[in-house]
Amino acid sequence: MVNPQNAFIKSMSVAELKKIWEPGAQGKINSWKDVNPAWPDQKIKLYGAGSDSGTFDYFTEAIVGKAKSSRGDYTASEDDNVLVQGISGDKGALGYFGFAYYIENQKKLKAVAIDGGKGPVAPTPENVDNGSYQPLSRPIFIYVSEKSLEKPEVKEFVEFYMKSAAPLVKEVKYIPLPAKAYTGNLEHLAKKKLGTVFGGQNEVGLTIEQLMKREAQL
């Protein structure tokens, strides 16, 4: 996100974001011109998630290449409202936080299209849903142990979760998975299929379609 009065940023590449956010940028990348010579010599004021946030972990891994690897001279907050206020009040600001807060504050912010190697892609529900907004979109899962599922109340909750997730996710301005993802997970639950498609490792840039293909092989 940038300030809505920022007229020169239309899109940014992952490489440009890395140049700004990697630990070695601290004390060296201080203005927009330091990132791209075509941009003005205007001070960058950075805003982002705090180090205890899952958003921080994912952003640093997706952009810098290593989770929790980030420059430290930025305004960090677990409260996204603080980040919204900071970016909206500073013409030179750049920041990141969850999509839901952008939707709630669209008039105060300017979303920047990200080029992950296939051209700039705007952060829209459609682009997240079709898998093209990469690498900054990620799925969020729940995991349930086989032993826990022996408890009727846990099994009932998970079934409720899968059947009710889509409308509830929309209500809080997140983006639901495709319907077939929920039905597929209900089938796995009924058959007590165990395992994870990630094999115990974090992976960045996977689409839901790719994950579902892996899941079918469990």
Regions found by a protein language model. Give the residues of each.
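Flexible loop/hinge segments at secondary-structure junctions
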Residues: 1-218
